[in-house]
Amino acid sequence: MAETPEPHKDNVSRRQARDPRLDVFRGLGMFIILIAHVPNSSLSSWIPARFGFSDATEIFVFCSGAASALAFGAAFDHHGWWWGTRRIARRIWEVYRAHVGVFIAVIATLGLAEALLPGADYLRDRMNLGPFLDAPGLMLAQFLRFAYVPNYFDILPMYIVILALVPVMMALGQRSPWLAAAFSLTLWLGATTHLIELNAEPWSERPWFFNPFAWQLVFFTGFAFTRGWLPAPPRRRGLLLLSLAFLAVSAPVSCHYGFSCYAGWGYAPMLGDIHDWLDPVIDKPHFGALRYVHFLALAYVSFILAGERG
């Protein structure tokens, strides 16, 4: 009888069970992000960002961290660090190609729209791509090496940098989860205090909108829970009440223009002043500390509501 061929190593981690809950919440996060970027949408008054410091971005990045632990963890566990790093490198290359492809597709699509619609100025006005149009060859070279990260094209570069940190975190975590946590927190501290920055364009000091060294904290929080480096939180009434209280208190001061920002419910100057005072710790590009606390509180409430099998 012929021997059954051994499964190819590339297929091992792909066979790990997918958690449909992650796909659901990532899809929900993407849908909310879409609503947030639709101009003049009445639905944008009701997205999570209007009622708290964190928003759908945290949901998406956290779930991406958990999904990455499922997708790549087995490669590191069963075949070693180098094989796992190879899998990560392959994924980075896939995401990089998608990043370049989407940019070219957007340029082509909006360029065609401008040619067909007199007076339309999507590329310069809406997308702020004037520098690319003025020097396409130079800017394309800068774009390919992440020295030029235009508006709306910063999500995938952030994801690529965070993915590149996975082998480092795995090496540390396999020795001690505390080492991985210390490394992640140190990176976050450097980024959230503006000590670690990446420039988004060569002619100014504008940083990437999403600092990957700050946002890796929420990514690796999801990663750590899925890997088992972090235990499931205890189900305690006091902790639930504390989380609910924090969510309730943060809602009125979550936006510059008062409660719910753009809902047209009136502007309260005092709430706006409090928001401005809190800005260093709720800053989105550098993932301020209160954004993290708010997300953890929201996640804990969701965890409790989901029940024992949640």
Residue ranges and their predicted role:
Residues 2-310:
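Alpha-helical transmembrane segments and their immediate juxtamembrane cytosolic regions
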